[in-house]
Amino acid sequence: MGFFWALLSVGLVSAAQLLLRSAMVALPPLTDIVAFLQHLLHFQPGTFGLFFGLLGYLLSMVCWYFALHRLPLSKAYALLSLSYILVWAAAIWLPGWHEPFYWQSLLGVAIIVAGVLTIFWPVKRR
């Protein structure tokens, strides 16, 4: 059950990152605090992304709490790195994001996957 909570946390935090990124693109900069607050108060584009992104972080923390009660920290923490892969892939493939693909990035993703697999690889006890 710990894997379930950890993976749910990873999914939520990844979605939250994407929502917050879209919100930051749509909302005015914080240097213009009046315009920023007006956008928030009048539910302008980006407002829902900001609110749902923050909600995603909150729900992710709740799931993480449950995951840490059921998994060793060394294994649970390794699963968090899967969020980097999900956000990277979504930023490349989702329409409207226009993030470029680089082979070096794919190599980095492969190294992350190899690291997670190494941590979870069963160890034979002698």
Curated annotation (Swiss-Prot):
Periplasmic side: 22-47, 98-100
Subunit structure: Heterodimer of ArnE and ArnF.
HAMAP family: Flippase_ArnF
Protein purpose: Translocates 4-amino-4-deoxy-L-arabinose-phosphoundecaprenol (alpha-L-Ara4N-phosphoundecaprenol) from the cytoplasmic to the periplasmic side of the inner membrane.
Primary localization class, coarse: membrane
UniProt-recorded Gene Ontology molecular function terms: carbohydrate derivative transmembrane transporter activity
Membrane topology: Multi-pass membrane protein
Protein name: Probable 4-amino-4-deoxy-L-arabinose-phosphoundecaprenol flippase subunit ArnF
Cytoplasmic topological domain: 69-76, 122-126
InterPro entries linked: Flippase_ArnF, Small_drug/metabolite_transptr
Transmembrane annotation, as ranges: 1-21, 48-68, 77-97, 101-121
Family from the record: Belongs to the ArnF family.
Biological process annotations from GO: lipid A biosynthetic process; lipopolysaccharide biosynthetic process
Keyword DNA damage: no
Gene Ontology CC terms: plasma membrane
Keyword Transmembrane: yes
Keywords attached to this entry: Cell inner membrane, Cell membrane, Lipid A biosynthesis, Lipid biosynthesis, Lipid metabolism, Lipopolysaccharide biosynthesis, Membrane, Transmembrane, Transmembrane helix, Transport
Family matches, as Gene3D superfamilies: 1.10.3730.20
Biological pathway: Bacterial outer membrane biogenesis; lipopolysaccharide biosynthesis
Gene designation: arnF
Localization in the cell: Cell inner membrane
